[in-house]
Amino acid sequence: MKTDIHSQKILILDFGSQYTQLIARRVREAHVFCELHPFDMEMAAIRAFNPSGIILSGGPKSVYEPGAPAVAEELFELGVPVLGICYGMQLMSRHFGGEVVPAGKREFGHAELLCSGQPGQLFDGFFVGGASPVWMSHGDHVSRVPDGFQVVAYTENAPVCAIQDVSRNLYGVQFHPEVNHTPRGDQLIDTFVRAICGCTGHWTPGQIIEDAVTRIQEQVGSERVILGLSGGVDSSVAAALIHRAIGDQLTCVFVDNGLLRLEEGDQVMRTFAENLGVKVIRVNAEERFLSALAGESDPEKKRKIIGSLFVEIFDEESNRIEDARWLAQGTIYPDVIESAGAKTGKAHNIKSHHNVGGLPEYMKLKLLEPLRELFKDEVRAIGEELGLPHQMVWRHPFPGPGLAVRILGEVKKEYADILRRADAIFIEELYSSDHYHKISQAFAVFLPVKSVGVMGDGRTYEYVVALRAVETKDFMTASWYPLPYEDMARISARIINEVKGVNRVVYDISSKPPATIEWE
């Protein structure tokens, strides 16, 4: 009997925390499906969602301020377990008659959590060895606990850091269990969703593939699908998944826009057309893209130009494919969340997404997005399960607009050729020195400025290439990767000696924030 992987699910209500997506990822790591929605989700929609449990996120506001974000009173009457995190705990406390006030001493960063008595099921194993390290980020605290609630934990600066009313299945923590700085936080979330909410863990790569294949077959029927294949992880996994579901009904369009990595086009064709037997049409559109980008320096406008031209080319190709009724995309869940936030005004859209932009009315193509429920790590796991090459599945993220947003300012063919060669050397050296898989993302950036140099007996005046490598768990924050000096020196020497037009290499040591990972 086929398992319904959505039958057990957790609802996460977002109050504006920078960590909310991490909550969802921790729940998924427990092999339980969840969705993230704004805090003001209507009760009718919540009842229709029928959650096995609810998590209230943190947030930047104070619960005692006029107009502070809140939930409907009926939420706590649904009879399902509720876990409040930071602001969520304070909201729950205030709702049930407790008191929340500004803290005499705010807590931001590491803290030692101490147990106040009997920890109970949620905290089983959390205090092994005494104090448990946690991550705090709050300026308010609960000064009076509501009737029926027990204080479970405290810190040196905050007397109430975890509360519970076991009889009503209500739990609250002042710290952030979703972040890596709380080492046992994933264990706490796992306990909540599985032991307390009763979810048994159907959300696994094999089950997700089986469910997606069925849904694609039901959605598409006998109609044909066209997919824009970029060679990146998301579109590659989407192509493999759809091909498993409908076989030759899928035609992939691989647009070589002249802004891809070195030999990427040939690699894509080998993997999909030759090894997997997927129908792939290769479109050489380098001149069209470079012509459209000529003279444009604004990064957001470059993204829009590239996105619009991709849609235009897909439209042309779909008209050549008989009965093409669907356009498939590799949209993933973080894209959906961020784009939805941009529409509602409840999140700040830092960069426009290449995939989630909607389709022009005239295209008359229906949209197929089989990965839209998945985070990147889940997409990779599915890619491996589908048999895609390990190197393709675990390749570092590559932006939809390609090298266009790694060339600062105007995009020119000369710049793209220089950049792709420099980038290839950088990545090759990271592999050979065993750094690649320790780094979350690495790439070269072309700087359209020249500097004076000396080669042999002659003076040079050539371009600068910047190298960027970062470590991150979630891509919301990132630290620059401390590449050893000897490796930096070797990479720099190779680029300067092997890439004509470059006489200087610099290494980016900026973290996110304040810098973003990509330069544009």
Curated annotation (Swiss-Prot):
GO molecular function: ATP binding; GMP synthase activity
Protein name, entry field: GMP synthase [glutamine-hydrolyzing]
Organism classification: Bacteria, Pseudomonadati, Thermodesulfobacteriota, Desulfuromonadia, Desulfuromonadales
Subunit structure: Homodimer.
Catalytic center residues: C86 (nucleophile), H176, E178
Function text: Catalyzes the synthesis of GMP from XMP.
InterPro entries: Class_I_gatase-like, GATASE, GMP_synth_C, GMP_synth_GATase, GMP_synthase, GMPS_ATP_PPase_dom, NAD/GMP_synthase, Rossmann-like_a/b/a_fold
Originating gene: guaA
Record EC number: 6.3.5.2
First and last residue of the signal peptide: none
Residues annotated to bind ATP: S230, G231, G232, V233, D234, S235, S236
Provenance organism: Pelobacter propionicus (strain DSM 2379 / NBRC 103807 / OttBd1)
Entry keywords, A to Z: ATP-binding, Glutamine amidotransferase, GMP biosynthesis, Ligase, Nucleotide-binding, Purine biosynthesis
